[in-house]
Regions:
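HIT superfamily nucleotide-processing domains
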Residues: 1-132
Length: 132
């Protein structure tokens, strides 16, 4: 059975798309820790990131790097944090969070954004990604 993230990447479940390639898909987290909190997933279903084959993992990180640059271009910040947890959905994924301090990486806190804010955020990241 397809995972939640596979369905999102395939367009079966709506998402706030930030970037995509033939192998990877990036979209806003619907329960963001900070504005611009983006999830990056491989289209190929793999439960655990470190079970990915070496080349796929390398390509995944390069794609995530490009998404991080787009996030930073759209929403200037000191850094874009990369977090791998992988317990909530059984599909490898990377959290990218624009941060200005370590306190910004607190998964117990969330920001509420309207649908319009989410659409605008995704569009801004998507447009920045296309320019890279």
């Amino acid at each position: 059975m397809a995972t939640l993230f596979s369905k999102i990447a395939a367009g079966e479940i709506p998402s706030y798309k930030c970037a995509e390639s033939d192998k990877f898909y990036a979209f806003l987290d619907i329960n963001p820790v900070v504005k611009g909190h983006t999830l990056v997933v491989p289209r190929k279903e793999v439960d655990y990131i470190f079970d990915m084959d070496d080349q796929d993992l390398a390509d995944f990180e390069v794609f995530a790097k490009k998404v991080a640059r787009a996030i930073r271009a759209a929403y200037p910040c000191r850094k874009v944090a990369e977090v791998v947890l992988g317990l909530e959905v059984n599909h490898a994924h990377i959290h990218l969070l624009p941060i200005n301090s370590e306190a910004d990486v607190d998964f117990h806190k969330h920001v509420k954004l309207s649908d319009e804010e989410m659409k605008t955020t995704a569009k801004n990241i998507y447009e920045a990604f296309k320019k890279l």
